[in-house]
Amino acid sequence: MYRFTLLILLFSCLSLQAQHSYTRLEAAEVANSERNIYRLSSKNSICISINGKGGKARLMINDFVHETGGNDEELEYAVFGNAKEKRAVVLLNRRAEVSLGCDMFIIDGKGGIFCGSIPVAAYTKTDKGRMDYNSILPYISIIKVSNRYVLSFETPLVVLYPFGDREEILNGRSIFYTYQNGALELNR
């Protein structure tokens, strides 16, 4: 009886926490422009443009600017939004010859916050049928529970710390990242 009461109490506490799902947003292209508009709600949107300066690609999100580290680096990104929160999470793929993970940014009406780097690549087949370190962006899902963002990976295999000293191949569902109080943290 005690365990049953404890389970009911635990379930009640979990269901009281606010949970918001962040969905992947599709861009509305602006004619004759390099800009894309992502609508968060009927009144809120973010504008993203990619252009080069000094041989480096720049991602401009409203007033927030992020410049790539290398001259040949491509910018690949995904935008996730939640209309109730009036916020967007932008994930920017870090790439050399293969994916090295992604950087996370939270964008709201006040600007952008760099949350940190997520050193995870998808270990999937390339067009040629070989296994390789590919972008994790198509396989990420994001929810927000209370004041914590949870990023999970919907792919069978991931590479943690690609090309690093601690590189390891894991089941994609066995790890997730949380962002809370200014800290991005790996959870196993």
PLM regions and their residue ranges:
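Structural motif
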Residues: G55-A57, E97-F105, V159-R173
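Repeated scaffold domains used in trafficking and secretory/extracellular systems
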Residues: D72-V79, T124-I140
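Long, charged/polar, surface-exposed segments that mediate recognition or autoinhibition
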Residues: R87-G129
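Beta-strand C-termini and the immediately following turn/loop, strongest in propeller blades
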Residues: I50-N51, L91-R95, E154-T155
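Terminal domain-start segments
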Residues: A18-V79
